[in-house]
Amino acid sequence: MTVVVTVERRMKPGSLREIHRLQAELWEIASRTPGYISGETVFSASDPDRFMTLSRWESIDHWWDWENNGERHDLFEKYSGILEVTRGPRVWRTTQ
């Protein structure tokens, strides 16, 4: 069953350029990960420092593989000074 995973984050003020770079790198790595379907980053309309990622996976097991991906962990370590998770990850099942 397909799942959608959401994670809300807050970035350090003034770090939007780095966030765009991080997201581009993450989506590139995810695209090579088995089970990845799609991903998107959306930014808060009321708070410029908040954003959310939504990723779609073929199964929760595929997402767990992504969650434990070494390249992914290395990237988050690299950008840890500008990020804070505020909610998530949350896993949602689809009806399809």
What are these regions, as identified by a protein language model?
Residues 10-20:
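Short, surface-exposed ligand-recognition loops at beta-strand->loop->(often short) alpha-helix junctions
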Residues 12-14, 60, 94-96:
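Generic structural motif
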Residues 23, 34, 46-48:
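Generic alpha-helix initiation/capping and coil-helix boundary signal
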Residues 3-9, 40-68:
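Short, well-ordered beta-strand segments in beta-rich or mixed alpha/beta enzyme
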Residues 1-2, 96:
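Absolute protein N-terminus
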Residues 18, 48-49, 73, 82, ...:
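A broad, structure-centric signal for solvent-exposed, well-ordered loop/edge residues
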Residues 25-38, 56-90:
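An amphipathic, aromatic/His-enriched active-site/gating alpha helix that lines ligand/cofactor pockets
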Residues 42, 90-94:
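Flexible, low-complexity linkers/stalks enriched in Thr/Pro that connect modular domains
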